Amino acid sequence: MKQIRLLAQYYVDLMMKLGLVRFSMLLALALVVLAIVVQMAVTMVLHGQVESIDVIRSIFFGLLITPWAVYFLSVVVEQLEESRQRLSRLVQKLEEMRERDLSLNVQLKDNIAQLNQEIAVREKAEAELQETFGQLKIEIKEREETQIQLEQQSSFLRSFLDASPDLVFYRNEDKEFSGCNRAMELLTGKSEKQLVHLKPADVYSPEAAAKVIETDEKVFRHNVSLTYEQWLDYPDGRKACFEIRKVPYYDRVGKRHGLMGFGRDITERKRYQDALERASRDKTTFISTISHELRTPLNGIVGLSRILLDTELTAEQEKYLKTIHVSAVTLGNIFNDIIDMDKMERRKVQLDNQPVDFTSFLADLENLSALQAQQKGLRFNLEPTLPLPHQVITDGTRLRQILWNLISNAVKFTQQGQVTVRVRYDEGDMLHFEVEDSGIGIPQDELDKIFAMYYQVKDSHGGKPATGTGIGLAVSRRLAKNMGGDITVTSEQGKGSTFTLTIHAPSVAEEVDDAFDEDDMPLPALNVLLVEDIELNVIVARSVLEKLGNSVDVAMTGKAALEMFKPGEYDLVLLDIQLPDMTGLDISRELTKRYPREDLPPLVALTANVLKDKQEYLNAGMDDVLSKPLSVPALTAMIKKFWDTQDDEESTVTTEENSKSEALLDIPMLEQYLELVGPKLITDGLAVFEKMMPGYVSVLESNLTAQDKKGIVEEGHKIKGAAGSVGLRHLQQLGQQIQSPDLPAWEDNVGEWIEEMKEEWRHDVEVLKAWVAKATKK
């Protein structure tokens, strides 16, 4: 089949090559020849011979028929060939078209795939867009809700600020008001809209505006908060005191936009404070007045009974007089407790450390205590542990008061047996007293409470408190601590109690070369002008003065005293403070005005008013102060003070200063530090302590106000450690008390300890600085 197609193709190609006519003629000739040959072959086969007619007939018919047939066939073939060629061209075109279609199809497929991909991407993007739209709708909804909440919160905050009684305002960098609350509107009489863009000078009075502008400047200049008090006027003329706090405020990037201010009306607090101060002054005045009114007859009883005891008496008279004398002294000591309680509340307790004849002190203590014990049929024993110093530096009056409280309590709670006082003196300048009784004892659960103010031990029958004020032990312990010591107690119920008192009392070195004791030195005989208006006091004072060998002139009024006084006529002037026509202070001022100071003798106040500060008398021109009743030891000490040598005075002052330093400072530790590291380290540490202490005290006070027990204890512990590290013994002891909530009546006393620390720490620091400077010079 393939050969035929090739032959046919050859046929067509030849025809196209030779042309239709020539190919037709050639084909016709070939057919004629083929016809002749076939005719001859057939004739030969059929007839066995070939005749010429046969040949001619074949040629004739071949020539007649073959050209036309060949031509027709050639035309047909030509047409077919042309058709084939056209068809081939068409096929080729179709192939090309097919290829193009295939290419387009591939491209279309690619485009479709790409389109599908784009469609998928678009669908995804559309989905994401829809999701974004959904989220955007949610966010818009949330923002709308947030906006509503913010508006509600803003409205709530505005309502809250407007409902607040405190002032709230803010000003911009130009010091113009930017907004305020309702309270501020009421204060200024202007609405917020009216207040905006106004300056303080447009709102407040000139005086108030000046302070407002000054404080604003401080806030803007230093970028710190500021708190102060200021009186402001309401539109109706009312005045109110505000505690104002101003703070700078910033945006998120730290740019300052102005200040915010808050003001709290503390007018009522001020009134309350004023009322408290007035009440305190009234109480002090009352106690001062009652002191004078009670002590005047009491001093007469004590003085006259003491004078009468020196006269010849029967046994019964002596017994009665001793009872009167002891009762009056006891009453005086109870009153001293009340006075000291008031002084402690006002932080006015002052120690008068002077050389005290300790031998005479113990003798007086034994005599008076024995008198009291005899009233109840008790034995009194004084058991000193030798050696004891002849003289010590201490406040003899306070020490006598403490011991009298302890001994009086021992006698009060002892029905039978004895009261024993043991005394010893240790190295370190510490005096120890043990007051032991055989009385009812103290229950163990009350041992930690007996030193609390107003606490009274209950008896063992029915739980009733014992008689008394309940302040004696509390006052005594505070005095003991002020004197560098303490009071402790041990007791067994039914067997008695032992109170141990320790105080810091340096001994006075005795001069080996002295030919005689200072106490043996005779006192000078003085001409004394006694200014006193109460006859009983005159009798007591005159008796004491004349007993010491002095001559006495008496003036009953201030006018009489000024008329009687002549320079050089009197060696000593004793001035009562409360006279009918003027005060002793007025007399002192008048004398110092009339005469040169060198022409005046010592002017000494003689008063029963124990509340007055000694400095007040000294400022009025007085030289010293004696309390009533006038006692021989006090008068003797005063005379020696003005008629002894200057060297003795300087020695006394130096010893007194050392005593105060040792009570406040840890001298042994500081001396070791000074020797090891020198003064610079102590000074540097003290500077750090001085810088930190205000913060400590501030936190302590805030914790106390908030009743934060844990915070108080923690801050007390910090102060204790800091004070101990720089040798401030007194502050360390206070810190120890503050950090020890298990101490008896801690909650009742911690406020006083904190107040004491607040009042005293700067003084203690200055004492330490002075000690370091003095030790460095040495």
UniProtKB/Swiss-Prot annotation:
Q: Which GO terms describe its biological process?
A: protein autophosphorylation; regulation of DNA-templated transcription; response to oxygen levels; signal transduction
Give the protein's function: Member of the two-component regulatory system ArcB/ArcA. Sensor-regulator protein for anaerobic repression of the arc modulon. Activates ArcA via a four-step phosphorelay. ArcB can also dephosphorylate ArcA by a reverse phosphorelay involving His-717 and Asp-576.
- For whether the record's keyword set contains Transmembrane helix, the answer is yes
A GO molecular-function annotation: phosphoprotein phosphatase activity
Question: InterPro entries per the record?
Answer: ArcB_TM_sf, CheY-like_superfamily, HATPase_C_sf, His_kinase_dom, HisK_dim/P_dom, HisK_dim/P_sf, HKR_ArcB_TM, HPT_dom_sf
User: Mind telling me which Pfam families this protein's record contains?
Assistant: HATPase_c, HisKA, HKR_ArcB_TM, Hpt, PAS, Response_reg
The UniProt record lists the PAC domain at 226-278
Q: What is the protein named?
A: Aerobic respiration control sensor protein ArcB
Residue ranges annotated for the HPt domain, each copy included:
678-771
